[in-house]
Amino acid sequence: MINAGWRYAYPALHLNPRQETPYMKNATFYLLDNDTHQDGLSAVEQLVCEIAAERWRAGKRVLIACEDEQQAIRLDEALWARPPESFVPHNLSGEGPRGGAPVEIAWPQKRNSSARDILISLRTDFADFATAFTEVIDFVPYEDSLKQLARERYKAYRLAGFNLNTATWK
């Protein structure tokens, strides 16, 4: 007879093998097929705003890690310009309510340490703090030189133990 007590000591072991455990880290790379600029935002920046809105509506707390302060300000302004019915509560890192808004926009010199569910990374290099997240969203831009940097980040996520996926936006 098998002792079923191990299920209580190690609850994740009795999950369906295909079911993700709460500890599994996932990185999804969105493939972009163009770099159309609209309203002062690149295609990837437009997509970041849409993904952040979608994840916030799903009840997640999001950190958007920008390449620099100028990019953070562009995203901040774009999120403020959304119609009232699609408003996304957000703030630049270090601003807003205590604990931050559900969506925080940061850059390398300015990042809060409040808990977030998802990292949306616009960084061209692998963000060393990405390993603190169980879900990361990254991008494979249209431009060839930026694709090579995305390949390097993909390898870094794999080495960090992330389950890797690719996707396209609807």
Model-derived segments and their meaning:
Residues 38-41, 45, 71, 88-92, ...:
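Short Lys/Arg-rich amphipathic alpha-helical segments
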Residues 2-5, 9-21:
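N-terminal polybasic/positive-inside topogenic patches
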Residues 75-113:
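Helix-adjacent hinge/juxtasegments
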Residues 65-68, 106-108, 120-123:
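Short His-Asn-centered micro-motif
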Residues 17-67:
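Long, hydrophobic N-terminal alpha-helical segment
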Residues 134-170:
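Glycine-rich, aromatic-bearing surface loops/beta-hairpins
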Residues 60-61, 116-117, 134:
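Short coil/turn segments at beta-strand junctions that form active-site/ligand-binding loops
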Residues 112-116, 121-130:
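SF2 helicase motor core recognition
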